[in-house]
Amino acid sequence: MSENQDTQKSFLETVKFDDRGLVPAIVQDHETGKVLMMAWMNLESLKMTLEKKKACYWSRSRNKLWLKGESSGNMQDVHDIMIDCDGDTLLLKVSQKGGACHVGYHSCFYRKTTDGEQMEICDTLMFDPEEVYGKKS
């Protein structure tokens, strides 16, 4: 397909959702390039994200739309949405307010290993999840 033909298709027509109607979305800080999280999107959440310029995902555990930051206030303003060469993965470039991770860190990728056994925290704790979401029963 030529470059011209490739850009003639609409963005939504290009996205290849899986058999559950989902596509993975990698979320990246628009200024630093730091990877913040990975989430799932369906057609409805993608359309809402495009319309509102706020990240909206599909929660597989709750089986419903999830506007990022709706309960915590840690919203994601969307600057760009990119699609990979196969059309089966999205990259959202966002400005993150507060932490992206539900356990309180700036990024969900807040742990690292150098030896394959021990882990260390390599990110900034932005908030106390118990204060934001309440204690788990």
Swiss-Prot record:
The keyword Amino-acid biosynthesis applies. It catalyses: 1-(5-phospho-beta-D-ribosyl)-5'-AMP + H2O = 1-(5-phospho-beta-D-ribosyl)-5-[(5-phospho-beta-D-ribosylamino)methylideneamino]imidazole-4-carboxamide. Belongs to the PRA-CH family. Zn(2+) binds at C85, C101, C108. HAMAP family: HisI. It is an enzyme of class 3 (hydrolase). Pathway: Amino-acid biosynthesis; L-histidine biosynthesis; L-histidine from 5-phospho-alpha-D-ribose 1-diphosphate: step 3/9. GO terms for molecular function: magnesium ion binding; phosphoribosyl-AMP cyclohydrolase activity; zinc ion binding. Its cofactor is Mg(2+); Zn(2+). The keyword Transcription does not apply. This is Phosphoribosyl-AMP cyclohydrolase. Binds 1 Mg(2+) ion per subunit. Pfam families: PRA-CH. Homodimer. One of its GO terms (biological process) is L-histidine biosynthetic process. Catalyzes the hydrolysis of the adenine ring of phosphoribosyl-AMP. Keywords: Amino-acid biosynthesis, Cytoplasm, Histidine biosynthesis, Hydrolase, Magnesium, Metal-binding, Zinc. The gene is hisI. GO terms for cellular component: cytoplasm.
